[in-house]
């Protein structure tokens, strides 16, 4: 009989989206309205070489006896009884709610193995919410985006640990990451090209395609929708989204333009690498910096293209100056790749595609555990954390929780007392030692559990 997982959690946290992702087809209706799933649905799930039965359940919620909500809950309880293990899903962007905490207790009482799944983990809000979930006592959260297919290699590891050994072993040249995340070497890299209006985004993509596929005009705002085009460059597939220009909010007046901007922001969230295209005549303006900050908050790899370079009077050292300017204006993502381009003349196309591919590789970085531990010991020894109110802060150890972007948790004695300046020191040191330019690096703090805390409570 197939190993069975039940997906449980409160309404509208993405259970059906995860179910559809694992089953490989849209068997479950997905909508933003809580309670869309009313029955339990079963399907044959697959993740890499893992095969299992998966049950999608209604959102756990209290309801009057005999009501539709109560019957939905009964279906969920039946699914839990049938399952060998549970996937407890919560919305990391929303953070933990009282219902999440109540039904985490419910999951524990089921006396089944539980995989804690932090869905919608994109961006800083999602990562903070994921770290919150340690309080549930269900182990390490697996950070994913069911909608975008991110974090599946981490989910694979968590499911693999609970399942019996497969009858057939993987061949030596098959890698888990390739299997579980749709084979990175074959799946197109998703790239969004964003920037202020009339920066030359569509002209550049037309040059890349070798045809006038996208409408261009000197008038700002020609592109209204996010348009996706498929590009094969030197044997590697890319899916590139041309987006509407992003103006300051106060200058967005027409309803259609508001929708276009919302579409561009969605493209950023869906992308893996984002190219911020600037006009060489007006670079690093306030709106450029706002867009770059958005890209960093969403956890996407960043490449800066300074377009219309043909209009710049050529002098030595200009590219080096651009890099200096970028590090000055964007200290949160030091070392971001910068490419000078001319969409009109076709200059810089190859350099841009190489930069995108390199940024994607950095974004997917996993640091070997031994090297990470060596770095941590040296970084703390060279610059110990400051004492707070006369008490020394102790940093115990570090672990990488995920890639895409590289994210780490530092276990320490007092998480709330570690200054932001020291956290920035760790991020910059980590970025420099492991060569992680131009991609967000997340370091979260978590207090190490005190094994004597319960004894003190018992005495008091």
UniProtKB/Swiss-Prot annotation:
Classification via Pfam families: KH_dom-like, MMR_HSR1
InterPro entries reported for this sequence: G_ENGA, GTP-bd, GTPase_Der, KH_dom-like, KH_dom-like_a/b, P-loop_NTPase, Small_GTP-bd
Swiss-Prot/TrEMBL keywords: GTP-binding, Nucleotide-binding, Repeat, Ribosome biogenesis
Binding site for GTP 2: 195-202, 242-246, 307-310
Swiss-Prot/TrEMBL GO biological process terms: ribosome biogenesis
GO molecular function, one term: GTP binding
Gene3D superfamilies: 3.30.300.20, P-loop containing nucleotide triphosphate hydrolases
Residue ranges constituting the EngA-type G domain according to the UniProt record: 3-167, 189-364
Ligand binding (GTP 1): 9-16, 56-60, 119-122
HAMAP family recorded: GTPase_Der (MF_00195)
Binding partners and assembly: Associates with the 50S ribosomal subunit.
Entries under PANTHER family matching the protein: GTPASE DER (PTHR43834:SF6)
Stated family: Belongs to the TRAFAC class TrmE-Era-EngA-EngB-Septin-like GTPase superfamily. EngA (Der) GTPase family.
Protein name stated in the entry: GTPase Der
Organism field: Rhodopseudomonas palustris (strain BisB5)
């Amino acid at each position: 009989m197939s190993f069975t997982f039940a997906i449980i959690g409160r309404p509208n946290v993405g259970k059906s989206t995860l179910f559809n992702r694992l089953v490989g087809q849209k068997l479950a209706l997905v909508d933003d309205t809580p309670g869309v799933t009313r029955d339990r649905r079963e399907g044959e799930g697959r993740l890499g070489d893992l095969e299992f039965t998966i049950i999608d359940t209604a959102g756990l919620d209290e309801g009057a006896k005999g009501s539709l909500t109560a019957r939905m809950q009964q279906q969920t309880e039946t699914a839990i009884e049938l399952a060998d293990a549970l996937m407890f899903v919560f919305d990391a962007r929303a953070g933990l709610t009282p219902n999440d905490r109540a039904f985490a207790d419910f999951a524990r009482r089921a006396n089944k193995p539980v995989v804690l799944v932090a869905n919608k983990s994109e961006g800083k809000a999602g990562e903070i919410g994921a770290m919150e979930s340690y309080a549930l006592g269900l182990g390490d959260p697996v950070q994913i985006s069911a909608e975008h297919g991110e974090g599946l290699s981490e989910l694979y590891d968590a499911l693999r640990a609970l399942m019996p050994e497969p009858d057939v072993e993987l061949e030596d040249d098959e890698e888990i990451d390739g299997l579980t995340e749709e084979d990175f070497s074959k799946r197109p890299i998703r790239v969004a090209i964003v920037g202020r209006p009339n920066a030359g985004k569509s002209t550049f993509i037309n040059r890349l395609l070798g045809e006038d596929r996208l409408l261009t005009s000197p008038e700002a705002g020609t592109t209204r929708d996010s348009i996706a085009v498929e590009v094969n460059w030197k044997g590697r597939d890319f899916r590139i989204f041309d987006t509407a220009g992003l103006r300051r909010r106060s200058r967005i007046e027409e309803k259609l333009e508001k929708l276009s901007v919302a579409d561009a922001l969605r493209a950023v969230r869906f992308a893996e690498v984002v190219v911020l295209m600037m006009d060489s005549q007006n670079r690093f303006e306030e709106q450029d910096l706002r867009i770059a900050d958005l890209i960093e908050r969403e956890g996407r790899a960043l490449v800066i293209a300074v377009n219309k370079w043909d209009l710049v009077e050529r002098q030595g050292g200009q590219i080096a100056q651009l890099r200096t300017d970028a590090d000055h204006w964007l200290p949160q993502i030091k070392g971001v790749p910068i490419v000078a381009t001319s969409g009109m003349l076709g200059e810089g196309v190859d350099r841009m595609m190489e930069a995108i591919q390199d940024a994607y590789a950095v974004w997917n970085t996993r640091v070997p555990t031994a090297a990470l531990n060596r770095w941590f010991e040296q970084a703390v020894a060279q610059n110990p954390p400051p004492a707070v109110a006369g008490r020394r802060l102790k940093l115990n150890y570090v672990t990488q929780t995920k890639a895409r972007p590289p994210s780490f948790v530092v276990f320490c004695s007092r998480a709330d007392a570690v200054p932001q300046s020291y956290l920035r020191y760790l991020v910059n040191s980590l970025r420099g030692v492991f060569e992680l330019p131009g991609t967000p690096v997340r370091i979260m703090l978590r207090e190490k559990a005190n094994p004597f805390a319960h004894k003190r409570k018992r005495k008091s």
